[in-house]
């Protein structure tokens, strides 16, 4: 794999097959619409989906059939603007929302553009991602960063947008008790957003003690490590140890693990709300009797939608959510493959890949 960046115009980190990646110099993308902008990508976070494509070549129905640039959690600096762009100028620092909907279908017109069937989402086959020197986006999918948000923090607006959408789906209100299963980046950010929304109790659940220790220092009011017992027994212990009475108001699953789903359903109070944010196996066993007899409100959550990125930026700018502490490593662009290996091995919380240096 070549590591030369000295003469590259648009060096890109390209997935060619399972565990097969290369650096490839590609043409600088053209602005195809007068509302487009060209972004010089400065930082990109490594997401679990990127690692999954690298390791397996597919996620569900999305199969990598040809070379694809990885990456979608990015920030950058505006390098060029289209003739109709009014809200941004060259030199502006932006967070990049990496999914472009059709804007015309029923979900788009209803304000749920994250459900658009024609969504062109970065690093989701067949669309290239943002691990390149340059990337083109419509101006309204770039969010200008205030002076008190760094470009490194700007790259975390993507996972924070995911967490914002999940917590909004849960309709978290002040004083509620919220249990978050999975203390990875999205789960931790769900804890932080729930705290910003006024939740009184925020309980992080994970099987890794190191993650729980971080969660307690970060945003959780308490933590819970499940025992190797039934979901009902773990739910009972969760309630008792955290004085939850008949159960929690809200459960968010950011793990996708079947045991977490089961425990989450059982630990909710009657009439509680369950939101599935993590994706695991496409089909699992589900405690439907408990869900029905407790009249639970059960929702899914997918990516982010209208207003989520703006709220994410606002939460960080106001100091209500801290994303800086999640950044545990920054590597140079030519070390991208090694960074993927370290993320796969579970090292750190959020690793960023720096953009190509001029």
Swiss-Prot record:
It catalyses: xylitol + NAD(+) = D-xylulose + NADH + H(+). Zn(2+) binds at residues 47, 72-73. InterPro entries: ADH-like_C (IPR013149), ADH-like_N (IPR013154), ADH_Zn_CS (IPR002328), GroES-like_sf (IPR011032), NAD(P)-bd_dom_sf (IPR036291), PKS_ER (IPR020843), SDH-like (IPR045306). One of its GO terms (molecular function) is zinc ion binding. It is an enzyme of class 1 (oxidoreductase). Keywords: Carbohydrate metabolism, Metal-binding, NAD, Oxidoreductase, Xylose metabolism, Zinc. Its EC number is 1.1.1.9. Its cofactor is Zn(2+). Binds 1 zinc ion per subunit. PROSITE patterns: ADH_ZINC (PS00059). NAD(+) binds at residues 182-187. GO terms for biological process: D-xylose metabolic process; L-arabinose catabolic process to xylulose 5-phosphate; sorbitol catabolic process. Pathway: Carbohydrate degradation; L-arabinose degradation via L-arabinitol; D-xylulose 5-phosphate from L-arabinose (fungal route): step 4/5. SUPFAM superfamilies: GroES-like, NAD(P)-binding Rossmann-fold domains. SMART domains: PKS_ER. Belongs to the zinc-containing alcohol dehydrogenase family. Xylitol dehydrogenase which catalyzes the conversion of xylitol to D-xylulose. Xylose is a major component of hemicelluloses such as xylan. Most fungi utilize D-xylose via three enzymatic reactions, xylose reductase (XR), xylitol dehydrogenase (XDH), and xylulokinase, to form xylulose 5-phosphate, which enters pentose phosphate pathway. PANTHER family: SORBITOL DEHYDROGENASE (PTHR43161:SF9). This is Probable D-xylulose reductase A. The gene is xdhA.
